[in-house]
Amino acid sequence: MRKIVINGGLPLQGEITISGAKNSVVALIPAIILADDVVTLDCVPDISDVASLVEIMELMGATVKRYDDVLEIDPRGVQNIPMPYGKINSLRASYYFYGSLLGRFGEATVGLPGGCDLGPRPIDLHLKAFEAMGATASYEGDNMKLSAKDTGLHGASIYMDTVSVGATINTMIAAVKANGRTIIENAAREPEIIDVATLLNNMGAHIRGAGTNIIIIDGVERLHGTRHQVIPDRIEAGTYISLAAAVGKGIRINNVLYEHLEGFIAKLEEMGVRMTVSEDSIFVEEQSNLKAINIKTAPYPGFATDLQQPLTPLLLRANGRGTIVDTIYEKRVNHVFELAKMDADISTTNGHILYTGGRDLRGASVKATDLRAGAALVIAGLMAEGKTEITNIEFILRGYSDIIEKLRNLGADIRLVED
């Protein structure tokens, strides 16, 4: 069993560069199945989710080459083989294969999504969209079987009953080669949706409106190869900004798009965090006299659910009391119990997190219960006096590229230990 060991209480200083967006690349890679030539992705993060996706693509017959942060995928040899639950149960984003396989082959058998345990993640919106486009869906144990083999996919008007990033992207992927026009109403607006649409358009798709709540897709017969640069990871950026404010003595975060983080940064400014925003970087000063605030997550451009956990340790430095309410994943509270082991004054009731800042944290043995909870524990361990040991670190490695090396370069006493 691997674990992360941190000797905390050290001031950190220096620069850190943000990798490509995890939440983009996990959709971009399956979308490449639709191309009839090589697609190259730049700025691909070195995370275990990418390694898993590459393995799946190779099992299906794709040729994949990786060097540094470049991923070159030739999908011409892909075959439509069933992908059972066992092979992809670590991936939340396995459902993107639904759209890409339907779009290329007219059918798909894929295991149900895995990933972090944040409560129910229904795929009903995905299925509703596919069925509107002419597919049938049925469960076979832990697998989903989809078929539009007889009639093929056709355009449709689809209203998303709730705002869903995954369902919006999946519908776009399925619709780009469907016959006719597809209109997605009440679409999610996240930057990652724009990134996927940009790749697909560069491959020859006709998508308009990505980043707004109405997306229009006119189907095309073929998609060609292209080269695409993955956008910076706004969640990784927000995590390191929170870390820099919590334990930094001056840290510059490079490869950041401020416009993707405006809601998050506004809340930090409400706390009193001092920072300087440049064109593609943010410099976070050493902090003092921070104020407790309330956080409520919301779909983009609101406060991202993926950032409420990484922000929590910084909130514990602030003076006063506050609440955190996650309206997206109300069960995203498991980090609270681990932070309490580190002597944090924090609790949860009825899905609300209640905290009182100002108490020093102490090192402890804790467990990462999901990806962003793991990030919160890393930050807390860097803040705490003494040694912190974090287990279940596979969650952390799913989403944070080179996290140990990046933190060591700032002066952190952190290491990965093989038990």
Curated annotation (Swiss-Prot):
Pathway membership, UniProt: Cell wall biogenesis; peptidoglycan biosynthesis
Catalytic site positions: 116
UniProt KW keywords: Cell cycle, Cell division, Cell shape, Cell wall biogenesis/degradation, Cytoplasm, Peptidoglycan synthesis, Pyruvate, Transferase
UniProt key word Cell wall biogenesis/degradation: yes
Localisation: Cytoplasm
UniProt xrefs under InterPro entries: Enolpyruvate_Tfrase_dom (IPR001986), Enolpyruvate_Tfrase_sf (IPR036968), MurA_subfamily (IPR050068), RNA3'P_cycl/enolpyr_Trfase_a/b (IPR013792), UDP_GlcNAc_COvinyl_MurA (IPR005750)
Residue list for modification 2-(S-cysteinyl)pyruvic acid O-phosphothioketal: 116
Residue positions binding phosphoenolpyruvate: 22-23
Residues that bind UDP-N-acetyl-alpha-D-glucosamine: 92, 121-125, 306, 328
Cellular component annotations (GO), alphabetically ordered: cytosol
Record's catalysed reaction(s): phosphoenolpyruvate + UDP-N-acetyl-alpha-D-glucosamine = UDP-N-acetyl-3-O-(1-carboxyvinyl)-alpha-D-glucosamine + phosphate
EC number: 2.5.1.7
Disruption phenotype: No heteroresistance to fosfomycin.
A GO biological process held by the record: cellular response to antibiotic
A GO term for molecular function: UDP-N-acetylglucosamine 1-carboxyvinyltransferase activity
Record PANTHER family: UDP-N-ACETYLGLUCOSAMINE 1-CARBOXYVINYLTRANSFERASE, UDP-N-ACETYLGLUCOSAMINE 1-CARBOXYVINYLTRANSFERASE 2
HAMAP family: MurA
Main function: Cell wall formation. Adds enolpyruvyl to UDP-N-acetylglucosamine. Target for the antibiotic fosfomycin. Involved in heteroresistance to antibiotic fosfomycin. Heteroresistance is the ability of a clonal population to grow one or several subpopulations at a frequency of 10(-7) to 10(-3) in the presence of a higher antibiotic concentration than that predicted to be effective by measurement of the minimum inhibitory concentration (MIC).
Similarity field: Belongs to the EPSP synthase family. MurA subfamily.
Official protein name in the record: UDP-N-acetylglucosamine 1-carboxyvinyltransferase
Source organism of the structure: Streptococcus pneumoniae serotype 2 (strain D39 / NCTC 7466)
